[in-house]
């Protein structure tokens, strides 16, 4: 078999080190031939016993599985691997292979799988890809004594996966009983599940335990199910020590229990008389979870303080991870029993670094508590911190804001005579994530009376800074102000919330909705310009035209305004006729299809039907001025200077369009993290009116490219409105109706060039918007009733417009024409292209 390089390294390192230490240690190689299965084997299982005083090394050359021992009808009273009392160290060197014990029913053996009688010697299992102890023995063996039992020390080191499950002992340590020191370190995956002891330590019993995670570490469902049982997962012997370090993975204690039927309670760890925790720490990004409490045997206090998240002396490593004590996994019935929620230590506790979290109504009890500035203590309402003999001194107390509405209180107690409670910095309202400020209850003001209760034997000292409150705010969601008020005797504190406003997230805002009115604005102006274009050309009595029309509007993004784009296209049909009085009447209809997008979450599809009516009156400039001057001296002075042949036109136009919108919203709502697409429909309309006049000046000099110059001035008004609507989907919002009003006075000049069968003109104009109401609407998030003004873009109020048109005659009855227009504003660009044909008669 080809062995991976990493496994060779794993096996080489301990082998070399052991060789240096043991010198003449006995070495035996194990391979697949050493496997045994009692259900298929024709021979009885033979245990291996080590007696070499210099120690024994078992070197694995292949994976080994020992299962179903003994054979049916036989008994097994000796450990599968035994180390005699006079023997040296016992080492199992995995070399990257697996080692499995399963269903080992050794009736009286101290350690069904591995037993060592050698005091002050060490049993080591290292370098395995998988190391498993399963039902060794199972609980069906009424006098079993665990999977591993050593009278010296034990080390489980540098294994990829360790699974220790469903083992049983009538004595201490359902899976492991170690009289000396037990070291478990750098295992990439470690699980103690469903192990059981009739006395102490459902999974582990030892004098001294060093537990350092190399990956996820789980203690789940272990139990000491007797009235005298202690330590559902781990029991530390009297005067022993416990060090727990979440160095490279989370450590979880969950569902571990003690007690006989009817008196079952949760217990993660039990500390024997005068036993102590020497280290409880987690590295950055890792957490130690105590869903079951820590208990103590006896009442003797320990002098050494527990410095949480503190490195060993001389070690510069920083521990900034999180330690969680939680009752969240308890059933409602279990939570009623305070024993299931109370962790007790007979030491002073100092919060040195990182974060300690109390959740789910737990009580953390110790001799006294102190806190360094680099650490945080986060407490849910309903949790308690109890100092039994000393004071409580806190510098960074944080209240979990998510628990504010549970109707409970945080309690700090240092009730021993002459002991104080001191809070030196402002209380902080902590949030787990910014989505808290999306909660609908923040839509109203609230007061949470007496949520912090203090009970001291002597003084309660609240520094001047601590009489204020620091709240972790979010730039999104409900905005408001948090305040804290202390009672006269400082024994209670009340926290209040005053709402101010609501700020939507980028996903909630949807500025595309009001910006759709700018699309209607562009489309109706382009339509009106096309009707004017349809009347251009040779002066026939009647004409009918059909054409395609397209428009593009691009609005650039700004710091507080999202960019968007509007694209539309469709068909226009129209007709014009010269009336008996010489006026020209034009009529047109259009159907447009549009697509709008905000380059983020929203895309709109629209369909517009529009109609327009245009009336043009042609006269000489002389007759117009004559009417305007009326009778009097001014007429006689000015009128002689006015040309009697210069043509002048007056025109008016009125247009109406109805639009049906269908918007698509794509969102990523948690949970689950799957893309959601929702469609919403609503309607709107647009009115547009225009009045204008122009004077055509013929170039009679013969010089210059253009033959006619036509200055003009217009007054354009556009009013667009869209209905209110409710969007249903992952992000459900209620949008009020919105409107856009714009009044512009374009002025410019048209330059014309005619040929025998062709006709061109170029238009340049300046168009200031003299009066405008920008689009906006009120948006309400239905999930929390948060409401805000969604503002559309504010296009620059001055525009430069250039248009170029061409006409070509196809005989006496037909004409082709095309038009290109470009509008420039400081914040946007728009284009339109039209092309079609006319039939003249």
Swiss-Prot record:
Tell me which residues make up the Autotransporter domain.
537-841
Q: What topology does it adopt in the membrane?
A: Peripheral membrane protein
Compartments (UniProt record) = Secreted, Cell wall; Cell outer membrane
Keywords, sorted A to Z: Cell outer membrane, Cell wall, Membrane, Secreted, Signal, Transmembrane, Transmembrane beta strand
Superkingdom in the source lineage = Bacteria
As given in the record, the signal peptide range reads: 1-24
Protein name as catalogued: Probable outer membrane protein pmp2
Q: Which organism is it from?
A: Chlamydia pneumoniae (Chlamydophila pneumoniae)
């Amino acid at each position: 078999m080809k062995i991976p390089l990493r496994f060779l390294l794993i096996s080489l390192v301990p082998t070399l080190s052991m060789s240096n230490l043991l010198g003449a240690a006995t070495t035996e190689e194990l391979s697949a031939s050493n496997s045994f299965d009692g259900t298929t084997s024709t021979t009885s299982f033979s245990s291996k016993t080590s007696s070499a005083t210099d120690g024994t090394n078992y070197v694995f050359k292949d994976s080994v599985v020992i299962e179903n021992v003994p054979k049916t009808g036989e008994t097994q009273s000796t450990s599968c691997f035994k180390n005699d009392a006079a023997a040296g160290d016992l080492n199992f060197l995995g070399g990257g292979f697996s080692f499995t014990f399963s269903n080992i029913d050794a009736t009286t053996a101290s350690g069904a799988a591995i037993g060592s009688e050698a005091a002050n010697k060490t049993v080591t299992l290292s370098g395995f890809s998988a190391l498993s102890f399963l039902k060794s023995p199972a609980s069906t063996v009424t006098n079993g004594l665990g999977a591993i039992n050593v009278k010296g020390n034990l080390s489980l080191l540098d294994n990829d996966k360790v699974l220790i499950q469903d083992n049983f002992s009538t004595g201490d340590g359902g899976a492991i009983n170690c009289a000396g020191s037990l070291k478990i370190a750098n295992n990439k995956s470690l699980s103690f599940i469903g192990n059981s002891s009739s006395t102490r330590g459902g999974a582990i019993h030892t004098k001294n335990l060093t537990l350092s995670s190399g990956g996820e570490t789980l203690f789940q469902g272990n139990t000491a199910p007797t009235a005298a049982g202690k330590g559902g997962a781990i029991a530390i012997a009297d005067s022993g020590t416990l060090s727990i370090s979440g160095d490279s993975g989370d450590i979880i204690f969950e569902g571990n229990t003690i007690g006989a039927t009817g008196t079952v309670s949760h217990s993660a760890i039990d500390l024997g008389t005068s036993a102590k925790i020497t280290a409880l720490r987690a590295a950055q990004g890792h957490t130690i979870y105590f869903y079951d409490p820590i208990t103590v045997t006896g009442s003797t206090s320990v002098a050494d303080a527990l410095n949480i998240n503190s490195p060993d002396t001389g070690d510069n490593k920083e521990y900034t991870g999180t330690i969680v004590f939680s009752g969240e996994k308890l059933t409602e019935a279990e939570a009623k029993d305070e024993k299931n929620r109370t962790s007790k230590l007979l030491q002073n506790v100092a919060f040195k670094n990182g974060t300690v979290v109390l959740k789910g109504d737990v009580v953390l009890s110790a001799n006294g508590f102190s806190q360094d500035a680099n650490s945080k203590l986060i407490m849910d309402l309903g949790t308690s911190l109890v100092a039994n003999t000393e004071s409580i001194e806190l510098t960074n107390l944080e209240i979990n804001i998510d628990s504010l509405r549970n109707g409970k209180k945080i309690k700090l107690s240092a009730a021993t005579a002459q002991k104080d409670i001191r809070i030196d910095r402002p209380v902080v309202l902590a949030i787990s994530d910014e989505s808290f400020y999306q909660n609908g209850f923040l839509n109203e003001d609230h007061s949470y009376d007496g949520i912090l209760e203090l009970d001291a034997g002597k003084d309660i000292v609240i520094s001047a800074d601590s009489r204020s409150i620091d709240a972790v705010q979010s730039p999104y969601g409900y905005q408001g102000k948090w305040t804290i008020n202390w009672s006269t005797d400082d024994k209670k504190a009340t926290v209040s919330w005053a709402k101010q406003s609501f700020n939507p997230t980028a996903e909630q805002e949807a500025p595309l909705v009001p910006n759709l009115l700018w699309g209607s604005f562009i489309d109706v102006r382009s339509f009106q310009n096309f009707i004017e274009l349809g009347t251009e050309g040779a002066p026939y009595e009647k004409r009918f035209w059909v054409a395609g029309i397209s428009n593009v509007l691009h609005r650039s993004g700004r710091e507080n305004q999202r960019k968007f784009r509007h694209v539309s296209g469709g068909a226009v049909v129209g007709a014009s006729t010269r009336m008996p009085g010489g006026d020209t009447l034009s009529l047109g209809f259009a159907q447009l299809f549009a697509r709008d997008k905000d380059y983020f979450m929203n895309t709109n599809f629209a369909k517009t039907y529009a109609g327009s009516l245009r009336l043009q009156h042609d006269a000489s400039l002389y007759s117009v001025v004559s009417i305007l001057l009326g009778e009097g001296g001014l007429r006689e002075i000015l009128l002689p200077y006015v040309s009697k042949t210069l043509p002048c036109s007056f025109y008016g136009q009125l247009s109406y369009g109805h639009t049906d919108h269908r918007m698509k919203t794509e969102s990523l709502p948690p949970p689950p993290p799957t893309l959601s697409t929702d469609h919403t429909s609503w309607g709107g309309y647009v009115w547009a009116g225009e009045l204008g006049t122009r004077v055509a000046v013929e170039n009679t000099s013969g010089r210059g490219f253009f033959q006619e110059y036509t200055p003009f001035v217009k007054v354009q008004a556009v009013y667009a409105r869209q209905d209110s609507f409710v969007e249903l989907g992952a992000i459900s919002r209620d949008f009020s109706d919105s409107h856009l009003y714009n009044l512009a006075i374009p002025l410019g000049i048209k330059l014309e060039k005619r040929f025998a069968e062709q006709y061109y003109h170029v238009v340049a104009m300046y168009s200031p918007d003299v009066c405008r109401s920008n689009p906006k609407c009120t948006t309400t998030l239905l999930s929390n009733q948060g409401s805000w003004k969604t503002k559309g873009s504010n296009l620059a109020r001055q525009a430069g417009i250039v248009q170029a048109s061409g006409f070509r005659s196809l005989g006496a009855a037909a004409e082709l024409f095309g038009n290109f227009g470009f509008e420039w504003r400081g914040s946007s660009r728009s284009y339109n292209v039209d092309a079609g044909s006319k039939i003249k008669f």
